[in-house]
Amino acid sequence: MQITNMHCSGQTVSLAAGDYHATIVTVGAGLAELTFQGCHLVIPHKPEEMPLAHLGKVLIPWPNRIANGCYRYQGQEYQLPINEHSSKAAIHGLLAWRDWQISELTATSVTLTAFLPPSYGYPFMLASQVVYSLNAHTGLSVEIASQNIGTVAAPYGVGIHPYLTCNLTSVDEYLFQLPANQVYAVDEHANPTTLHHVDELDLNFTQAKKIAATKIDHTFK
């Protein structure tokens, strides 16, 4: 276990258990690197550099895109800042570029916490926690929890954004299996739209098959 000083990705925490090694950064509570016997299990990024897109980030209080940054909740309309202009969307929440705090640390685990204050597009309060744990036999586990510490009910979603890899080889030959039988179609800006059976969009991965040239930027259910 090792902590480095502040840089583009905040602080860096290095964890190890058996043949597994992980690098966690405090900005976005991100997973910057995960290896087994030296082989990469996620696409890594250098903590001293700004990562590609939301590589490795925790996405709170929503993952994916909200078209035009506009949503309705309990009869009221809210407007979020547009942070992906190519899709004209509010993407991946409000904590991906915040510097989380390290609250607990061991040789094999780290706990990070963050406070999300109210804002005009999301006037709710959350206290969030992420725990990364390495086990020499089972590898990495991630636990994410958020508590609504405001006085009214809050809309909430969560996701994580690692880019899985088999030691940085091409995904075309990978076998992919996902136990989901529904998927959201996307519009020309990759915003999710209507729910379909996976067969309708030719995205049925309930049985393992090669990814090949299939483009997957969808929400499955």
List the predicted regions and their residue ranges.
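Beta-strand-rich N-terminal accessory domains
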Residues: 1-80
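Extended, loop-rich substrate-binding clefts of extracytoplasmic carbohydrate-active enzymes
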Residues: 2-3, 82-136
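Beta-strand secondary-structure signal
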Residues: 12-14, 21-23, 109-113, 129-131, ...
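Acidic, contiguous internal or C-terminal segments within carbohydrate-active enzymes
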Residues: 15, 116-156, 160-167
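Surface-exposed interaction patch
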Residues: 23, 65, 73-85, 172-175, ...
